Amino acid sequence: MTRFLFTSESVSAGHPDKIADQISDSILDSILEQDPKARVACETYIKTGIVLIGGEITTTASVNIEKIARNTIQEIGYTHPKMGLDANSCVILSVINQQSPEIQYSINHDSDRTQQGAGDQGSMFGYATNETDVLMPAPITYAHRLIQRKSKLRKNGTLPWLGLDAKSQITFAYDENNKIIHITAVVLSVQHNKNIPLEALREATMEEIIKPVLPQKWLSKQTKFFINSGGTFTIGSPISDCGLTGRKIIVDTYGGMARHGGGSFSGKDPSKVDRSAAYAARYAAKNIVAAGLAERCEIQLAYAIGIANPIAVNIETFGTEKVLHSTLVTLINNFFDFSPHGVIKMLNLARPIYKDTAVYGHFGREQFPWEKIDKVDLLRNSAKI
């Protein structure tokens, strides 16, 4: 019996907000490559024919921001003015200041690097669940996989009529035990050229994108498919919508299945706890679930600006814990260092690894260090299970 429905969405690399995220993280990576201690907060705004880059950057690195932006736009595939953004001819404006000296002092006021303060106040969440192989919620996982499949088929020429812009959305039905029953609805909107009839597009999308991605066990006669349900989608990207860094925070995280502190990720160096603490919380939650200590785990971290350690750590397992809650609290406090310096060291974050995070989600992708499950044995042994 269905207890509730849950829906998550994803967007493609060519979506305007994701163009902005990729530019911001490409600039961050280029700076970190030269200066791992750089302080970067880089925001990007996109509209037809124009890119505006702003923020606060303090670094010894020398980078060509305009060139980085153009190269990123080129790699995404925007190479003609008719697309709304041309890597070669678009206007790129840059308004960059240095980080506030007061904030810089609050972070670095102590000569002991282990006492590096948080760059801001705020709360961050990390989440894991055993309902998928990557210990992520199924709705966001499969929404991302649809978009990844679409991107692959566009790039390899299998579906040459595909455009750069796309959005996916999946609704799952869950039972009273929070277990998946089936998929009730799939929404997929793909930009396309004018040469393909709508019905041919829908058939090809179903056969080449949807069916190879979604597990048959979760599909039924009741599953509804909405492929380009609004009709033709030939005008997209920066022509139809502006783009802005950090506007897809739910797509970037857990698709709404877990709570969110509100801070975005892209364009921020790891001294910003908005980003690094969210990664650390995911790392801890994933290891708790991978160790079999809980079926679902959400960890909240809270910080005060200039203070080295979190002012609050909370763990929620939704009644799925296999050991005492007090044991879980002890384990995460003993085996995970959530101070800003500790997080950067624990996950090796002061390096150029961020551009790849800007599309298809920051979590559930094994190439990132916060996805390691290297503390499983330690946790299990300490919990005596």
From Swiss-Prot:
E.C. numbers: 2.5.1.6
Pfam family, one: S-AdoMet_synt_M
GO MF terms held by the record: ATP binding; magnesium ion binding; methionine adenosyltransferase activity
Enzyme type, top EC level: transferase
Binding locations of ATP: 15, 165-167, 241, 247-248, 264, 268
Free-text cofactor note: Binds 2 divalent ions per subunit. Binds 1 potassium ion per subunit.
Cofactor(s), names only, from the UniProt record: Mg(2+); K(+)
Annotated Mg(2+) binding sites: 17
Residues annotated to bind L-methionine: 56, 99, 241, 272
Main location: cytoplasm
Keyword NADP: no
Alphabetical GO biological process terms: one-carbon metabolic process; S-adenosylmethionine biosynthetic process
Flexible loop: annotated segments: 99-109
UniProt record similarity statement: Belongs to the AdoMet synthase family.
PANTHER family, per the entry: S-ADENOSYLMETHIONINE SYNTHETASE
Function in brief: Catalyzes the formation of S-adenosylmethionine (AdoMet) from methionine and ATP. The overall synthetic reaction is composed of two sequential steps, AdoMet formation and the subsequent tripolyphosphate hydrolysis which occurs prior to release of AdoMet from the enzyme.
Subunit structure: Homotetramer; dimer of dimers.
Protein name: S-adenosylmethionine synthase
Gene assigned in the entry: metK
